[in-house]
């Protein structure tokens, strides 16, 4: 099942008991965050606040608050099915040459599908049913959440920022938080390595002093949103990838103020520009780390046009100490990364980004160890293979007999298979998340790798321990007589 717009997905969630409408008046200032946080921690439904205080536009929250709903957005029933998305990405990133004529014929449909998914331009799009320009532009009329008591101002969180570099043929879609600065101004917090910031830097170099056109889409269809947070190959647009996932081309329309293309079924579109000379102090804001972050200067986005659907819905979220919605999204996308990593490192059995580690700051990887030093090779490869792991501070490597998603198993492996000095890798002066105030310098810090695998000859001079395992025949016998023993609640082994 594919969803052409956000509304059809909302209907689907409601029909399946995955969305709750709240008619009671709730304030976007702090109250929505408290409600959404309680519901998310209870693994509850998406929320549609129908009567936000002092506003006339409903607010959608917790849309991707469980891995199940992320899978549902892509037409899947189980988050594990998201590995199919990872397999597609692994193929697109590094397609294998055909092994023969029959294999070449078999691969033609996939190549053809990938090539036939450019966005489809439509006229009279829903996102331009209402148009506001000039003095009509007033961002304060949107029910933008003020998430935490220490936040400096309301914050746009789920906007798809659309940019294009002067040397690129495709547009870039990225999600960057945006501080409300005034009726027609937002602060665009994009870090220097992100796609939008790179496009902006290229534009400034080629057209110094000129205004840079930018568009932000709020409430796009769920597949396009997820396409924007997935590690799409640099040569492919997020629109094309969303079309592949959907099985239908992504419908777009031309913005009114520039040549950028926007998702045609979006609820709200913000059009405008960035003046390269206009910067503003951004923050502080409560973030996914569970702390308020430092302030810094970022470009100001001036909004010249607001277009929207009739009866538009404002899509929002909050970030805070995990679990939050981005953490749940990270749990689901974890399944996407597994096939991508296995493509490069077939010895990887499983890969896990614990949500309590902010979904990217720690990774645990299980491998089929084949030679001394193998664990160190895999940890170095993981750090360098995908940009998404550039900020991963800790990597733990375990053997295939250890469940890398079970902390009891992982801690057992660390405490019984590691010597702290021999099996710890420390790397200094590496890229670190700017929000990580624990690093000695903003954006630069160290990484730690833990080799918690069994040690081979050459890694140790001692006889290695043999794990204790019960005789399978005895286990089978006890299983067969368990009910007769009169012991309640047999543990699952």
From Swiss-Prot:
**Cited SUPFAM superfamilies:** FMN-binding split barrel, UbiD C-terminal domain-like
Which pathway? Answer: Cofactor biosynthesis; ubiquinone biosynthesis
> Per its UniProt entry, which superkingdom is the organism in?
Bacteria
The chain's disulfide connectivity reads none
- Look up the record and name the cofactor or cofactors this protein needs: prenylated FMN; Mn(2+)
Q: Which residues form the active site?
A: 287 (proton donor)
Q: Which GO terms describe its biological process?
A: ubiquinone biosynthetic process
Q: Which reaction does it catalyse?
A: a 4-hydroxy-3-(all-trans-polyprenyl)benzoate + H(+) = a 2-(all-trans-polyprenyl)phenol + CO2
> Which EC numbers characterise this protein's activity in its record?
4.1.1.98
| Keyword terms, alphabetized | Cell membrane, Decarboxylase, Flavoprotein, FMN, Lyase, Manganese, Membrane, Metal-binding, Ubiquinone biosynthesis
Give the chief site where it resides. Answer: membrane
What InterPro entries does UniProt report for this protein, alphabetically? UbiD, UbiD-like_C, UbiD-like_N, UbiD_bacteria, UbiD_Rift_dom
- Co-factor remark: Binds 1 prenylated FMN per subunit.
What job does the chain carry out? Catalyzes the decarboxylation of 3-octaprenyl-4-hydroxy benzoate to 2-octaprenylphenol, an intermediate step in ubiquinone biosynthesis.
What do we know about how this protein assembles, alone or with others?
Answer: Homohexamer.
Name-wise, this protein is: 3-octaprenyl-4-hydroxybenzoate carboxy-lyase
Q: Which organism is it from?
A: Shewanella sp. (strain W3-18-1)
